[in-house]
Amino acid sequence: ATFGAVVDQLAHVGGRVILTGMGKSGYIARKIAATMASTGTLAVYVHPAEAAHGDLGMISKNDAVIAISNSGETTEMADIIDYVKRFQIPLIALTSQRDSTLGKRGDQVLVLPPHREACPIGLAPTTSTTATLALGDALAMALMVRKGFTKQDFGVFHPVSYTHLRAHET
């Protein structure tokens, strides 16, 4: 998939953009969901382990799911992936491994470039999480542009920040 194709799909979602990920990818997914929600794209985070305990009901046929996993093999995401495939809910995969389970099951796949984690022993998610966050922020900003989200719209979702910024404009 191309970045533009993913933006097109997300811009036309009739429901919400659901983000999911486990561990460090889950923290990144939460941040991306928060950025999207505060910039005009209805988005929420669903924890993949909680999904199998009833939270799958948070995902509707009008939604699209962005699943984040560096390896693409996060076992806790199996139930949420099975659910969205069963009900033909669009699945966008963000992973470093196109040939992974997630990469193969995604309707659209955005593959992160090859990288080495910045951690001295090369294991702690550092480079991968930074790249994923940058990609998620880029999606949110592209959706802002696509939807014509304005400074005034921003003020509606950020009344305290917006009032403070307006007070300090020259």
Q: How would you describe each model-predicted region?
A:
Residues A134, A138-Y162:
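Long, charge-dense, solvent-exposed interaction surfaces that engage phosphate-rich ligands
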